[in-house]
Amino acid sequence: MYRRLDAAASAEQKAALKNLDVSSVKQTELAGDDILAVLTKAPGNDASIGGVKVVTKNGWFAARPSGTENSYKIYLESFVDQTHLMQLESDAKAFVDAVFKAI
């Protein structure tokens, strides 16, 4: 199950998402699963992914600011079912909201 969302974001919020420091992430679970990785760089070449990707054993989400609009995008994938995907969506939005509240 896969889904993409778009939401409004100010320039300041977009910068916070793009420049997230993974050491500031306090969340340990996503959709009931332990978070296995919080990535801001590609594992293969250490290049910036321009946002953040959060991985669990049963799914993941990535959030990144739009380069052309005052918005950000969340990409989600559940390896379980639609209900799990909806929980991923809720938790991903909460994750991004926490990033925005920290600025």
Predicted region positions:
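Phosphate-binding and adjacent anionic-ligand microenvironments
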Residues: 1-67, 71-75, 81-89, 93-103
